[in-house]
Regions:
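Pro/Thr/Ser/Gly-rich low-complexity, intrinsically disordered linker/stalk tracts
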Residues: 21-65, 116-137
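Short beta-strand segments within Ig-like beta-sandwich modules, predominantly Fibronectin type-III
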Residues: 84-90
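Beta-strand-rich modules
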Residues: 96-125
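Residue-level signal for short segments within beta-strands and strand-turn junctions
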Residues: 57, 73-77, 110-114
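Extracellular low-complexity, O-glycosylation-prone stalks/linkers
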Residues: 61-83
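Bacterial N-terminal signal peptides that target proteins for export
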Residues: 1-8
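C-terminal motif of bacterial Sec signal peptides marking the signal peptidase cleavage site
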Residues: 15-19
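Short, linear, compositionally biased motifs with a strong N-terminal bias
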Residues: 10-11, 86
């Protein structure tokens, strides 16, 4: 009897851990929108402790997004994620203070917020572009 209970318990555990699921539901992000990447991303090291990033906003931004578009910059210092800033008025440059002894990587992305007409209930209100990576050593 004890053996039957053990086998039944094992069978129940195996079935519960390998239950069916619909992969399409998990993979579906539900968005058919994309945000274009920033263009012409460059940096200029003004002096030993200041770096200015410059970029341009693409001329074609889908009308589904509010203007102005935000720019998000992630800051990685010596391969450690340090900070993220968001510029909200379509700025095309930003200056950072750096430590000359450290290596920096900046990831520049556009962030679009849907207009009220295009916002779907239960869905994200923003779309982020792929990042453009700038290495400063």
């Amino acid at each position: 009897m004890k053996k039957i209970v053990t086998i039944f318990t094992i069978l129940l555990v195996v079935l519960s851990l390998s239950s069916c699921y619909d992969r399409d539901v998990l993979d579906d992000k539900g968005l058919n929108y994309f945000m274009p990447m920033t263009e012409n991303v460059q940096y200029n090291q003004d002096n030993a402790t200041a770096v200015t990033l410059t970029w341009s906003i693409p001329s074609v931004i889908p009308e589904d997004f509010r203007r102005p578009i935000s720019v998000q910059i992630q800051i990685v210092e010596n391969n450690i994620y340090r900070d993220r800033i968001t510029l909200v008025n379509e700025e095309t440059s930003h200056t950072f203070t750096i430590d000359p002894a450290k290596k920096y990587r900046y990831i520049v992305k556009l962030v679009g917020t849907f207009t009220e007409e295009n916002q779907e209930t239960g869905r994200t209100s923003t779309v982020t572009s792929e990042g453009v990576i700038v290495n400063v050593e």
